[in-house]
Curated annotation (Swiss-Prot):
The gene coding this protein: CSH1
Protein name (database record): Chorionic somatomammotropin hormone 1
Lineage: Eukaryota, Metazoa, Chordata, Craniata, Vertebrata
Ligand binding (Zn(2+)): 44, 200
InterPro entries linked to this entry: 4_helix_cytokine-like_core, Somatotropin, Somatotropin/Prolactin, Somatotropin_CS
GO MF annotations, alphabetized: growth factor activity; growth hormone receptor binding; hormone activity; metal ion binding
Subunit text: Can be found in a monomeric as well as dimeric form.
Gene Ontology cellular component terms for the protein in this record: endoplasmic reticulum; endosome lumen; extracellular region; extracellular space; vesicle
Residues spanning the signal sequence: 1-26
GO biological process, one term: positive regulation of receptor signaling pathway via JAK-STAT
Organism: Homo sapiens
Amino acid sequence: MAPGSRTSLLLAFALLCLPWLQEAGAVQTVPLSRLFDHAMLQAHRAHQLAIDTYQEFEETYIPKDQKYSFLHDSQTSFCFSDSIPTPSNMEETQQKSNLELLRISLLLIESWLEPVRFLRSMFANNLVYDTSDSDDYHLLKDLEEGIQTLMGRLEDGSRRTGQILKQTYSKFDTNSHNHDALLKNYGLLYCFRKDMDKVETFLRMVQCRSVEGSCGF
């Protein structure tokens, strides 16, 4: 290859890589504590969203005298995330490494990326909320990217990108007057609340270990 052609090729390659290098450099200059603060904020918002939606659905559609039977139905008592090996108590959580906890959190978030697009469609009155399904999706997507960034920083400094799980939770059913649909949605919301609680707990543990002075919980 002629010297001029080689130079042109290298220049073109550098120009193509420049945006990625700039982004990677920008991430490296952000203090780890700030990355954790942002991830924890998003994790808390996701957990609160799950709590609020679960309570709203329960109050709107689940009769009080049927709540016990709904909760103990096999369709509502099993979560897809139960197939993902996760710590079940604080002692088990403490035995996991930071990267293990982040990987588990990432899997949990990715399992909800598609279902959360239909989260608010369950409610006949969508005016109950000020935000939309797309806002919920972008919240989880932002959290996913934040966890990937933290994994990269804790490993070797580069941002990690993972594959979306092929098997995830099913979509929420919009037929709010059908008993089977109510049962399905109630079970999904129970799992959503349970999983987001885990994500927030795991991230808090990793933050406590990684950032000095952040264990005040």
